[in-house]
Amino acid sequence: MNCRPLEKYDPKAFEDEIYTKWLKNNVFLPDNSLFEKFSMVAPPPNVTGVLHMGHALNFVLQDVLVRYKRMKRHNTLWLFGTDHAGIATQAVFERHLKKIGKSKDDFEREELVQEIFKLKDRHRGIIVNQINKLGASYDHSRERFTLDENLCKAVNKVFKDLYFKGLIYRGEYLVNLDPGSGSVVSDEEIEYKEVDGKLYFVKYFIDNSSFIEVATTRPETMFGDTAIAVNPNDERYKSLVGKEVTIPLTTKKIKVIADFYVDSAFGTGALKVTPAHDPNDFEISKRHNISKVNILTQDGKLNKNVPLQYQGLSAKDARFKIETELMEKGFLQDVKKHKQQVGHCYRSGEVIEPYLSTQWFVRMKPLADKALKALENGELKFYPKKWENTYKYWLSNIRDWCISRQLVWGHRIPVWYNVDTSELIVSDTDPSLDEKNMGKRFVQDPDVLDTWFSSWLWPFSSLGWPNVDVDFKNYYPTNTLITAYDIIFFWVARMVMAGLEFTGQVPFKDVYITPLLRDKQGKKMSKSLGNGIDPLDIINEYGSDSLRFTLSFLSVQGQDLNIDAKDFMFGAKFANKVFNASKFILLNLKNRKILNDLKFNDIDKWLLTSLNSTILGVESSFANYKYNEASKFVYEFFWNDFCDWYIEISKIDLNNENVDIQNMAISKLLFFLKKSLLILHPFIPFVTEKIYSEFAEKEDILALNEYPNFDIANNFQEEFEIFKVLKTFIIAIRTLKSEFNIPASVEIDVALKFDADFKYEAYFKANESIVKRMINFKNIFYNENYDGMLGVAAVGFEIYADVKSLIDKTKELIRLEKQLEKYKMLNISVSKKLENENFLMNAPKEIVESEKLKFVEFSSLINKINNYIINLKNL
């Protein structure tokens, strides 16, 4: 058999071509002829986003699982799409307008929406093509966008259903204003950062000579004060309760009230109450029925409710100006440095302003109760299990969800108001088109819905709901969700709530939370720190398979992933190993006949058994989302068993003069190569598909082949154990040569002394050619005189090697004594830790286990070095 020769491993030369081949041959489409179903939806990336390492990790782990399920003959659907990302996309568009000297105010609403759609169309290809570079095998024909017509239909239906159930309402509440976008954001979209601020001690005068001193971090909000609150038990202020004070720099008077919320020990013990701009003050105002004064515009500027000289200023600029005037006019008693936690919008980075506004909300508790029960009943599982606590915490402490956003980009709220009567109608279309509303005029609510309001419907809206068509029936509920920990509440919990409310089922059974990416210093990777790694740089340098295998191999369930760019060399070396080993086999096909009737010897049976074990290990690992274990199984099989042992041993028969023996050897190598490519394919699909295409039939695609199954007929436990014994001997001689710095190429005499009950003596003698190939010996002796040889004990036999003439005995003894002392000291240190009850009780479980392994390792090394020393002294 002859095939096209592989050149050097150059992923740039074939990865794009392979991906196109998969698309052309509909590899990623589900197969409805298969009985068992596997479906999964991908977290939709922002349509204007670019690929980062978090995306890469998430999509790689999804794709590895999807490819495995597809090859295991599941009817597999992986649904992908992009998110319209309201605030983020509109911000990108407004930055674009600024560059060309325009603003959003230059457009009518519909014109603006159309312009943003054009931007979306230009950007969508960027993130999608980048995800394709990873080898993502999602169904391209079913790609969705959260503003697609059917998804809009689903959003409107959900809004209406919740409204008529009394679970959506409109009310005036304190919300979180992002001044950058002019929109409100939810509590969960806020990141708190410690900032260096000031604590201002301000005088609120009762009359010309007496005043009450108030401590505040935000003097600019005093124009929204409607009371001063003190603790009822604070003796200092009891006589002032009920009296009026004047807000500094104004003539406005407000009352002193008593409320137990006030902490007498903080500041001066007197609290300015600003209900429209502080959540705690808002609650105080409700208890005391006092007014609320909003001093901000929607873009975070001071409004007409403040003195004229401050109107139009940002809060920060106003604070500086007010501080100066307070000082000049004698209202400022003191200013102290003060560290404080300040909320920032996680999307825009802007400081959040508490803001009194009329908004739309979802009552969440009735939905959350059902979602909690789903976890308790076992309908939903998290991997790792620890993330169940995060899920439970959010749902147990849930607040109503503010779903309205002051944007033009997104799902328009399906609510209309009668221009003349303010009557409210919930409808997809203009109610004036209805005959019963003839002559009435309506305007639609100007706000759009929070981006997450469409995202929480993703598992079923992307499958056609509210239409219950073939896709919905076949693939809902989905099997698995793979996502990041930081959107457990934003997305995961909300999807569970929506799924239960609108379909009566959880939208997925398993939730796998990916590791948190950190740099080598343990810092979380983030754009602000600039410590991220661009996955496209890694792909350009090493290829997609290198990125994929490294991320999968290092993804230990429940542990953070500390990584830098150099780590991807690991995946590159493995992909290169696969390529070069395959190249060796394919080169040896030349002028040889491939046999179908394979005769397996004991070494073949050892490898078949190892393959069986690997298949079981991979299956068990994927069942529990242990990617690193699955990766390790295939890595160990291919690199160690297949390459380091089987291929090397096969070279004996490949070099045999008998052509029939050569043909049998290459036929078995090709058989095992195909099995190897199959088990490796989900992890490194590009290089395995490329290699397979070099010897398979033209129309045969590796990705559509069945993943090998455990085969009891290929489980040869006795042959497996026998070869393990032979390996022990070979490894012992190799190790001995290495530890005494004897080059592997140097031939030495070796000897074996078998125990009386050792039953594999004949096997050893029959396989001398393998031993010769693997350790390069001069002569091998059995049960003879071992004087002058260095010995190593093994189970069932003793191993001896003649190294006396190749080493300096005195120097080696000195070296070994130093090594022995080093490992004894290390073992003492580990022993002390393991004897310390505090360490055992308080240290993380993985650290304790690591120390136990060290103790075993050091003890073994001490024993081995001691034996070397004793043997050397007797030479």
Curated annotation (Swiss-Prot):
Keywords: Aminoacyl-tRNA synthetase, ATP-binding, Coiled coil, Cytoplasm, Ligase, Nucleotide-binding, Protein biosynthesis. It is an enzyme of class 6 (ligase). It catalyses: tRNA(Val) + L-valine + ATP = L-valyl-tRNA(Val) + AMP + diphosphate. A motif ('KMSKS' region) lies at residues 524-528. ATP binds at K527. One of its GO terms (molecular function) is ATP binding. One of its GO terms (cellular component) is cytosol. A motif ('HIGH' region) lies at residues 45-55. Its EC number is 6.1.1.9. Residues 803-837 form a coiled coil. It is found in: Cytoplasm. One of its GO terms (biological process) is valyl-tRNA aminoacylation. It holds the Pfam family Val_tRNA-synt_C. InterPro entries: aa-tRNA-synth_I_CS (IPR001412), aa-tRNA-synth_Ia (IPR002300), Anticodon_Ia_Val (IPR033705), M/V/L/I-tRNA-synth_anticd-bd (IPR013155), Rossmann-like_a/b/a_fold (IPR014729), tRNA-bd_arm (IPR010978), tRNAsynth_Ia_anticodon-bd (IPR009080), Val-tRNA_synth_C_sf (IPR037118). Monomer. Belongs to the class-I aminoacyl-tRNA synthetase family. ValS type 1 subfamily. ValRS has two distinct active sites: one for aminoacylation and one for editing. The misactivated threonine is translocated from the active site to the editing site. The C-terminal coiled-coil domain is crucial for aminoacylation activity. Catalyzes the attachment of valine to tRNA(Val). As ValRS can inadvertently accommodate and process structurally similar amino acids such as threonine, to avoid such errors, it has a 'posttransfer' editing activity that hydrolyzes mischarged Thr-tRNA(Val) in a tRNA-dependent manner. This is Valine--tRNA ligase. The gene is valS.
